[in-house]
């Protein structure tokens, strides 16, 4: 198409077009642009949000929540007279122990308290405490002037015993445990059924089993099942390693066992898991030197707490060991450990399931034959199969690949199962189980 204007005139028109000044938007235009894309009730919602922010600001100013840079409230909000009165009314209390209650059934009972390393006093109750709150042998808080009882105190528990309580639930569930289907069912019958359906045992007139012994070769899933139980139940879970109860001084281990069960009785329902119980539960014998006397005292205290004169209450006890033949017969008898669950080596189906569990969190090929891998790992424990999966990932990392192939798993089987066979202690433990 011919250009009738000419190249020079067209260039001049384009320059005039570019030289037009850019007009800035005024406030009205900006407000109009902000309304684009808003819903019908946007203005009302914005107004309500502004009102809420203003109210929160006023509340914070009145309550003094917003503090200054020094970490203190503004001086205008200080109330020194009230603070002084509070300090005078709430004096620090002294810890004592109520040893005896005189005339407990009368309207004006008296309490004999023993202040440690000081003296004994016969005192009254303050107005804040009811007579039913105080029992003989209980620790109480008394004031320093009249020695009146102000508050009942919880029993004294060693901090090392308190730290054995598991606060956070483990992330292991029953679906993460492979090759232990029968063992998990037996464990749930003892632990979960009495807590969730106690009426079944009441109707039959029997007491549920209160103690379980988990035994088997290393790496078969004993501790893993206990972690799954802790995740499943809402009861308090306390984990104790047997060697923690072996103390330096005489009587310390027995005292820790006593305080452990005392703390467990304060809970609504409690599970105590003793791992490696053969550290303190070995059969008693006299070696002539008396080196194991303290360990035997600890075990005797444990035996007494499991089934002694005092009732155990709603406390379930789980114990795990690799050597059940070394445990004391008094610890193994029914009433203390009612059920013995053996964790044997997983079969072909169990090994295949364990491979799938560990491969679930890995980047692997889709067509890996896990049953073939399980057949190549006879008499292997779950821990060894987990090591195979880890080594397969290491082979993939060495080859700079993002996924693990079946070849990596086969090489890992040759390395872990075949090469490390001389380090395996499973056959040795199988002779004892």
From Swiss-Prot:
ATP binds at residues 216-223. Transmembrane segments: none annotated. Pfam families: AAA, AAA_lid_3, PRS7_OB. Monoubiquitinated by RNF181. PROSITE patterns: AAA (PS00674). The keyword Ribosomal protein does not apply. One of its GO terms (molecular function) is ATP binding. GO terms for biological process: ubiquitin-dependent protein catabolic process. SUPFAM superfamilies: P-loop containing nucleoside triphosphate hydrolases (SSF52540). The keyword ATP-binding applies. Keywords: Acetylation, ATP-binding, Cytoplasm, Nucleotide-binding, Phosphoprotein, Proteasome, Ubl conjugation. The modification N6-acetyllysine is found at residues 116, 422. Residues 8-21 have a biased composition (Basic and acidic residues). It is found in: Cytoplasm. It comes from the Eukaryota. InterPro entries: 26S_Proteasome_ATPase, AAA+_ATPase, AAA_lid_3, ATPase_AAA_core, ATPase_AAA_CS, NA-bd_OB-fold, P-loop_NTPase, PRS7-like_OB. Component of the 26S proteasome, a multiprotein complex involved in the ATP-dependent degradation of ubiquitinated proteins. This complex plays a key role in the maintenance of protein homeostasis by removing misfolded or damaged proteins, which could impair cellular functions, and by removing proteins whose functions are no longer required. Therefore, the proteasome participates in numerous cellular processes, including cell cycle progression, apoptosis, or DNA damage repair. Component of the 19S proteasome regulatory particle complex. The 26S proteasome consists of a 20S core particle (CP) and two 19S regulatory subunits (RP). The regulatory particle is made of a lid composed of 9 subunits, a base containing 6 ATPases including PSMC2 and few additional components. Interacts with NDC80 and SQSTM1. Interacts with PAAF1. Interacts with TRIM5. Belongs to the AAA ATPase family. This is 26S proteasome regulatory subunit 7. It comes from Mus musculus (Mouse). The gene is Psmc2.
